[in-house]
Design a protein with these regions (language model features):
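Solvent-exposed edge beta-strands and adjacent loop segments
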Residues: 2-88, 141-157
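Generic N-terminal initiation segments characterized by hydrophobic and/or small/turn-forming residues
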Residues: 11, 32-33, 113, 117, ...
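Intrinsic disorder/low-structure terminal segments
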Residues: 19, 47-48, 73-75, 107, ...
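Structured, beta-strand-rich domain cores
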Residues: 65-127
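Short beta-strand and beta-hairpin "edge-sheet" elements
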Residues: 120-169
Length: 177
């Protein structure tokens, strides 16, 4: 008999890095570290609020048709719907062009396409390096709206914006140079 295996836990807290890179030379099946740390990429790990949507999926379960003699019915895995949803990020309506306070707002012009790239399991402040693994989500940015984020005295001005997942994700792909 094979003994059960219990993998070690991987902490999530402060180990969730998100980078946006516009459509262009980036390849989700051969992700380039140089592109992800380059001038066209934007690390949004500390711009997106915790309330932002994360990529998700929902898979339908279809039931087999019952036959006259069946006492049971069974399920099939059906269609899967993938989405990202509404992200919320910091914004200063009085911010100077190209400043940190408006970088996400300027980068995510409605209609912009690119990839949200996620690295998990390593401190978010640690730089990306060759050999680390990332998951890439192709996406398109929807319209932007100024909204409050938080409550009462602690509220901040934010932008809420829908991101659509436009293709299949690439999970756990090693970063290349």
């Amino acid at each position: 008999m094979v003994a059960p295996v219990r993998p070690n836990s991987t902490k999530m807290y402060l180990r969730d890095k998100w980078i946006f890179i516009p459509t262009g030379t980036y390849s989700p099946t051969a992700p380039s570290t140089a592109l992800l740390i380059g001038a066209t990429a934007l690390d949004v790990s500390k711009m997106f609020f915790q309330s932002s949507a994360r990529p998700s999926q929902s898979t339908n379960l279809a039931k087999s048709p019952k036959r006259i003699g069946d006492g049971e019915t069974y399920e099939f895995v059906g269609e899967t719907s993938v989405s990202i949803g509404e992200v919320r990020y910091s914004f200063n309506p009085q911010g100077v062009a190209l400043s940190n306070e408006v970088k996400a707002y300027e980068k995510f012009v409605p209609g912009t396409t690119g990839f949200l790239v996620n690295r998990l399991g390593i401190d978010r402040d640690t730089d990306l390096t060759t050999g680390q693994f990332v998951t890439s989500y192709p996406c398109e940015c929807g319209p932007q709206l100024e909204v409050p984020e938080g409550d009462a005295e602690g509220a901040e001005i934010a932008i809420v914006q829908t991101f659509a997942q436009t293709g299949p994700k690439s999970i756990k792909v090693a970063l290349l140079a």
